[in-house]
């Protein structure tokens, strides 16, 4: 399998000129190269992008061109079937940084453990940066863009973490690798805002388009946008998706600046790079849910001993990047780590990948999924509740408000009504990914699929048992986290959250 042949948008400027500018900028910002390419251990660098699906041109997206991410794919290995184990930031990042399923470490509820009921990792589990520190690595978490002055060496400048368990900031030496000892290898996380760059208002979207045009030579043409069939071709929905694709362009530009810096510091060829996102696009059926829109992510690896120009279609999970990075640095993978080295010579491909969605902010849910080569099976523990049950975060978005308005006016198609606004959900969902890539038709109740359903039930139950995933969140944990959450909210939004908390508490008492 080979990557698709791509053509450049007409408005794109010469990338050779822009690349030269980036390289020159990196030289000014980063200073002279250190000449560390001969060091014994490779550097490890993770690009971690927020709220973004695989809408990059190397993955077939035709409305944008992403030359820097495409370069990583061309010079490395691109995975076409990589999935996050959690479709929301904090559980995903908690899993990523430990190489363990979030349900294994008790970190599955979004922004949990912040209050009077802190979450502690099991005694044997150690965050990945600590493992690298113990091996002599300099660890950092920031933007990947060299800064002037000493501020980039301070821990208070760290990039996003969002871990749901107790951890010590000393796991990171700084926000940038420029403070390390000459020749010392580094482990760096480069945080990119990704889909969070798109705003809610027309003026914000216009500003993003202007920025995309200035930084990449092109802004997205709305007429080129292709929506999934369960979203209406409505102006608000199209404008939002257009802004999202401009965020994809700017994400790519950020990657380009970091690559330019690595080249100027003569570090690129000895750096093991992973590009990924924490979960899919923030949309009605994306972020927070276990369909492809929420769990399918881009995953590209470039570096020493990584096959160049390779495209792999085997199933991988985002927790595999932890084990793969340790292996690349010749650090022993701990026996407790559930992620796998996807380049291991004796590696066995995964037969299935798993995911879990639990409480998101004030909104309680419990959904589990297992995916094989052909099938996606989803189990809903609260099927009597609608998919889009009240949630202040989602309901505050203009796209959700517009979808609810179209629903109220009867303007959605029957398919869109069924997918987005069914009053209840099925206890079990089964989708044939070969014939139904958008997961539109639940075939779990079809008698001819009875054996498949039984097999998927067994797979899912075995995985849950292996993680000790057998209980919902306790009322005390919920109360503790909601107390902290409300402290950060004001005005009308706080009132909405308080009402949602009351509703969720009532539903729990009723066994709903």
Give the label of every model feature segment.
Residues 1-13:
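N-terminal secretory signal peptides that target proteins for export/translocation
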Residues 15-27:
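Bacterial N-terminal signal peptides
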Residues 31, 46, 53-126, 131, ...:
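Active-site segment of extracytoplasmic enzymes that catalyze sulfate/phosphate-ester chemistry
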Residues 33-42, 48-49, 54, 78, ...:
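Long, internal low-complexity/basic segments
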Residues 40-45, 75-80, 135-139, 183-187, ...:
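Loop/turn elements at helix/coil->beta-strand transitions in domains of secreted/extracellular proteins
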Residues 54-63, 110, 167, 178-322, ...:
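Active-site-proximal cap/lid insertion segments
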Residues 58-65, 78-100, 108, 141-160, ...:
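Short, solvent-exposed turn/loop segments enriched in Gly/Ser/Thr/Pro and often Arg
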Residues 96, 144, 149-166, 268-271, ...:
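Polar, surface-exposed loop/tail segments
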